[in-house]
């Protein structure tokens, strides 16, 4: 069993977190949107994906999946941190990487031991 943090609970992040938890890992899914996290804790899904609601509820109930807004809580004891935050297009058409940058900085500030960081967000080549 691995300890995993997934940052961002949109389509990519929530599906990733739920699937890793269903494989038997302990997953903490983090989002800075307090309302989104509160809704997930109540079982309200922010997106639709066939089977996702059941997957989230089953793994939350088993204790393998939890949700938080706290980087310190989410990163405690984890081996892997997945960044799955939005990268919207800027007015010039380029990817806006501010959320990826903020997540990376927050990981650096709050990690207590070495960990592997995996970026699942869409970013330009060479980023």
Briefly describe each language-model feature range.
Residues 1-127:
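Structural/interface elements that position substrates and couple domains in central-metabolism enzymes
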């Amino acid at each position: 069993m691995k300890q995993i943090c997934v940052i961002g609970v949109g389509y990519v992040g929530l599906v990733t977190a739920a699937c890793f938890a269903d494989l038997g890992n302990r997953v903490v899914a983090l989002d800075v949107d307090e309302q989104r996290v509160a809704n997930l804790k109540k079982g309200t899904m922010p997106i639709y994906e066939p089977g996702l609601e059941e997957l989230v509820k089953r793994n939350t109930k088993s204790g393998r999946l939890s949700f938080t807004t706290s980087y310190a809580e989410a990163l405690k004891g984890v081996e892997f941190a997945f960044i799955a935050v939005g990268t919207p297009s800027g007015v010039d058409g380029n990817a806006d990487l501010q959320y990826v940058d903020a997540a990376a900085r927050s990981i650096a500030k709050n990690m207590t031991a070495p960990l592997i960081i995996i970026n699942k967000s869409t970013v330009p080549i060479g980023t």
